[in-house]
Amino acid sequence: MAQLETRTEPMVVNFGPHHPSMHGVLRLVVTLDGENVIDCEPVIGYLHRGMEKIAENRTNVMYVPYVSRMDYAAGMFYEAIVVNAPERLANIPVPKRASYIRVLMLELNRIANHLLWLGPFLADVGAQTPFFYIFREREMIYDLWEAATGQRLINNNFFRIGGVACDLPYGWLEKCIDFCDWFGPKIDEYEKLITNNPIFKKRIEGLGTIQRDQAINWSLSGPMLRASGVSWDLRKVDSYECYDDFDWQIASEKEGDCYARYRVRVEEMRQSLSIIRQACKMIPGGPTENLEAQRMVTEDKKSEIFGIDYQYVAKKVAPTFKIPNGELYTRLESGKGEIGVFIQGNNEVTPWRFKIRAADLNNLQILPHILKGAKIADIMAILGSIDVIMGSVDR
């Protein structure tokens, strides 16, 4: 008796570019064999706005407000890297107090970034409840930003060459510590609700596994790299700002799957809380009004309270500040991974070349590789675990 052969033809399906699970205007051209993914081609560029070319036609002071719109979940990180590049090229010192203020803002942004990742990721895999919890804590971070910078989510325009735009308002550090006291138990609450949930674990464990060598060869960074067993964090490696002053650990896992990436991000929020607590206690000068009062009553003009480390900016940079001749690449660790800037100056007020390295663009490149062999229902979970914001991918 002759056996019948079953032939299946591949089917091409378009995901996006306008879909709630695409995390922006990302289009995936997916080739399916039944429910199995056999190929995937990401199509990017829908949100390209020419940010690098804009940088080459703006002074640094004019360009800082632009960059928080690239990645609305990591605005402070992009502000920091945009001022760090000319600072290092021109050897401009940063006061210790300003560096501590920067660290406070960056770590608050890291927590906000991971919270904004956590809620939609859980919604993608079917857990709706925590999606509403994370915005409660994010609002508290927005309130802290609003008190210090005047803006909430984006366009904080707070970082400056040589420091920050203004000092922290009186009472801000106490409010920041209050937030830490509130948020610490909330992370425990998230973990009780999510981490050992059998449905959640069964849904994402073993999905999108990336081996250690693959993570290195694909130039992954951030939680994507650390979840594959590579303890690499630029805050430890490059020791930029004042991270060497604090006692904290690199969060890493070995499994390399979606669940490991979740565990890394949750642990990073705990470590960021620890850094914020230490920075609030160790910041030179303490609360602003106390610092100003000490300056007024100090008769000895040589007192350290008048030193550079107690200022919030080394020197107000003029709009005519010229970027010196030379080139360099500088980088920092954002919530998504390594973001960097290659700057080339020619002694003009605008840079001759300003190349931006976005962490999520590099991390997104491995998506077709880890999707092959997965089920169509797992595409959203794997994509969600990468954490992409298309504004910074396309720039």
Curated annotation (Swiss-Prot):
GO terms for cellular component: plasma membrane-derived thylakoid membrane. It is a peripheral membrane protein. Its main location: membrane. Pfam families: Complex1_49kDa. Keywords: Membrane, NAD, NADP, Plastoquinone, Quinone, Thylakoid, Translocase, Transport. InterPro entries: NADH_Q_OxRdtase_suD (IPR001135), NADH_UbQ_OxRdtase_49kDa_CS (IPR014029), NDH1_su_D/H (IPR022885), NiFe-Hase_large (IPR029014). The keyword Translocase applies. PANTHER family: NADH DEHYDROGENASE [UBIQUINONE] IRON-SULFUR PROTEIN 2, MITOCHONDRIAL (PTHR11993:SF10), NADH-UBIQUINONE OXIDOREDUCTASE 49 KDA SUBUNIT (PTHR11993). NDH-1 can be composed of about 15 different subunits; different subcomplexes with different compositions have been identified which probably have different functions. This is NAD(P)H-quinone oxidoreductase subunit H.
